[in-house]
Amino acid sequence: MGRSLLHRALTASAFVWAISSSASAQANAPIIGRWDLTVRGADKPYPSWLEVTLSGSRTLVGRFTAGGGSARPISRVEFHKGVVHFAIPPQWDAANGDMVFDGTVAGDVIDGTITTSAGAKEKFTAKRAPLLRRTSAPVWGKPDTLFNGKDLKKWDTFGGTSNWSVVSGVMENAKGGANIITRDTYTDFKLHVEFKFPKDGNSGVFLRGRYEAQIEDDGGKEPILVSLGAIYGLLLPNENPTKGPGAWHTYDITLIGRRVTIVLNGKTIIADQTIAGITGGALDSDEAAPGPIYLQGDHGPVSFRNIIITPAMSGAK
């Protein structure tokens, strides 16, 4: 073989080796997985969530949920020698800049800085999210009526001025203001809740205070990731059996670990699917801990009745 051919052959071999080495490194990159963040915001800490996956042989992509809004796609995650970087455009932010994420991975922890769309820098710590796998079927305890139609003794409010009251056996939120939250916390459970929303209404039922089952007047359109029945931004309902504004709807929700089944108005719209992570508006990112049921009241009027929870015997706190 001539020198020219030999040189080209060696160059090609080196290129293939470099590509293969790069692909192998990314396939085993410790950034891959799901991460629960606590971000030290200007006013107070808030939760966020990150997922990084391998696309093809060497490209890292992902999803990110900020303190509010829904999970956003990340077209490319840069990762080299323990350092991670990506940028995503704004979602609900008033500013127009990209949000920039920079961090350093050390084992099951990431420490770093988020630069917001407005240019503010916020430190964060992320921990690898727990799997929440269950090794046996739950043994259900006794049903507990969370709302008795008379008072709100099992509930507290947070996040603004409370407009919640009991009217003719119904828990009503007259206008946008505070959210309402159970005083008790739960791990695995079955939840029955009846709700009614006005035209253009928007609310939600947060499971363990972290995963929002969306309530919305969506006009009966084909389901999307942020419409009625969705786990907000993460799980898509397979149909939309809405009764429309002004009518009573029912949710029957079973949550075991990360696996959720949602029955809306008698139709199973999400069947034993895995919730990847927290949704926008979550109370915290401590996914392994028990959490409350919280009902969203900050978006506007909404009504609830007949709220009954059946906790797993080992799941109630």
Feature map (PLM): residue ranges:
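Bacterial N-terminal signal peptides that target proteins for export
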Residues: 1-11
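Bacterial N-terminal signal peptides
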Residues: 9-21
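Boundary at the C-terminal end of the N-terminal hydrophobic targeting segment
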Residues: 23-27
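Carbohydrate-interacting regions of secretory-pathway proteins
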Residues: 30, 34-317
